[in-house]
């Protein structure tokens, strides 16, 4: 039977599996819930991966008892070697027919491998946030990715938290809100289905669910699109924080990445980028200021890109490469540019 390669995109909110033939054709897809082992634990993580892969195998007409040739896992929280090793051991021990070979990479590495063979910057803003630079020689550098207790700036969680905190601080008279809190306060009570601030505490502590809390970001986006000044302010600040992540990795970027016809390629991953127009002003401000402070004359332009396919495709490619097989990839079909900018 012809070899089949698998890839997993594992996010903090949802996950996806792709099965790919040895000539690069996508055979089947399956999706599921979060596979971030830091959030849900190793046991639940491997069970969800196994269930999704087997569902994809059945869709592709493949016997679930026939192992994949390789499975490349592009996981949120996939950059800790010891945790990755434990995850692979669990997959091998509990599900021996899942795959012959495994490779665990970060969600950023899977994303960039989907979009380009040459490297670039991946800027993730979904439930959480992260920025990873992959240079042409494969070396990596990064900023962020430390989770909601230490960062996640510019993410859906961060936007939701900023909104809630501004309301709390304003009512407490601790800090004046930059704009009227009326819309955000009512949206907060409605989203969490509570009558007052005390009701919010249950969602912050006893019943805290990062994905659920981050979902409040959608209400802030709706407010911003309707013209609410505070919602627009929060998104502008989120754009600024995301831009500062790019500024942080500028000194580590191989100059070759600045020299292509599209400038520095920045791959934007995560649902917050759907609100690019709300992020744009703060993002450009942070990049312009950071470029000037660092005197980064090489950095003259950039292009923002988004994936047309799941980063599971890049995961499959990296997993295949790990065992010596190069999957054919049509990079022009895998990613599309949505914004370009040249500094004056």
Swiss-Prot record:
It holds the Pfam family BcrAD_BadFG. Disulfide bonds: none annotated. ATP binds at residues 13, 127, 214, 271, 275. Its EC number is 2.7.1.59, 2.7.1.-, 2.7.1.60. GO terms for molecular function: ATP binding; muramyl dipeptide kinase activity; N-acetylglucosamine kinase activity; N-acylmannosamine kinase activity. Belongs to the eukaryotic-type N-acetylglucosamine kinase family. This is N-acetyl-D-glucosamine kinase.
